Amino acid sequence: MTDRSLLILPGDGIGPEVMAEVRKIIDWFGSARGISFDVSEDLVGGAAYDAHGVPLTDATMEKAQSVDAVLLGAVGGPAYDDLDFSVKPERGLLRLRKEMDLYANLRPAQCFDALADFSSLKREIVSGLDIMILRELTSGVYFGEPRGIHTEGNERVGINTQRYTETEIARAAHSAFELARRRNNKVCSMEKANVMESGILWRDVVNEVHAADYGDVQLSHMYADNGAMQLVRAPKQFDVILTDNLFGDILSDCAAMLTGSLGMLPSASLGAPMANGRPKAMYEPVHGSAPDITGQGKANPIACILSFAMALRYSFDLGDEATRLEGAVESVLADGARTADLMGPDGGTPISTSQMGDAIVAKLAA
């Protein structure tokens, strides 16, 4: 009997393929390490629409609310492009985030030494890179009211509202400082306090939270435009970057390209603690459903595997096991194993999705 519950939502496109490799790793932890999980599986996105006419059923939503963690593969694809907006596959993902109130989006950007030459930047700038961007996910300009397009006089006007409350900023700040304590004890908060009132409030609240509870963590502030420049100029100066929804959306994609491949990038979205002390949580690879390679065995499963490693660390407090899994991934890459997305100009023979999963399991067992 285990007290660790996990809901798997493979989704669409390459989602089921990469999730199958995570299943191998879950099975290995159970058989080799005695660390078992109560795993259930359900449909989301286009797969749920095909079966039920909606991208996420109420029953699946209820299940997601009750487990310790949700692990999602990918949603969407061209087959669903003409659906009504309300039932598009992506609406299932957005409903999960909204109803679980997953306000802290964690986007790591880590460059394994074996892949440093795949970055668009010089090896010496990115080799050894390991930063974490915490993006506030449920407020800000994407959600603020009023919003919309209307007519004033003879022209159309588009309006979006950047709005943050103290509570929304403070809970994101707490998450960032707690995260830094697990890492290298540094937080850089990014906003535009020089031109935006929401940025002024953001900086004030972050300072207040820091002064009250996290004096041991080094805090700095940076305007977000300078932050984007610094991510490209000298990314290794950062540990944890804390920022709002809009800037986080932009900065995390910028940081993603420092690492060489979207197929390598995991993410976590965390909410408030549940009764058992574990945060509500959903983990997913950053990459999409990749319909162009679906069913061909070409997908890179590493982002999904590293998303499970994040679940081990942040939902199940199994940091040593997360490090073991991340080390296995790094070791496989150091040995030269590459899926198609990681093939360099010198060519070579890529391995399949399944072969990559098998290689990582073999390293875990070594």
UniProtKB/Swiss-Prot annotation:
- Cofactor(s) for this protein? Mg(2+); Mn(2+)
Instruction: Give me the residues that bind Mg(2+), please.
Output: D225, D249, D253
- Pfam family name, one: Iso_dh
State a single Gene Ontology molecular function.
Answer: 3-isopropylmalate dehydrogenase activity
Annotated compartments: Cytoplasm
Q: State where NAD(+) binds.
A: 77-90, 288-300
Q: Which reaction does it catalyse?
A: (2R,3S)-3-isopropylmalate + NAD(+) = 4-methyl-2-oxopentanoate + CO2 + NADH
Q: Function of this protein?
A: Catalyzes the oxidation of 3-carboxy-2-hydroxy-4-methylpentanoate (3-isopropylmalate) to 3-carboxy-4-methyl-2-oxopentanoate. The product decarboxylates to 4-methyl-2 oxopentanoate.
State the oligomer form and interacting partners.
Homodimer.
Q: This chain belongs to which protein, by name?
A: 3-isopropylmalate dehydrogenase
Q: Which organism is it from?
A: Jannaschia sp. (strain CCS1)
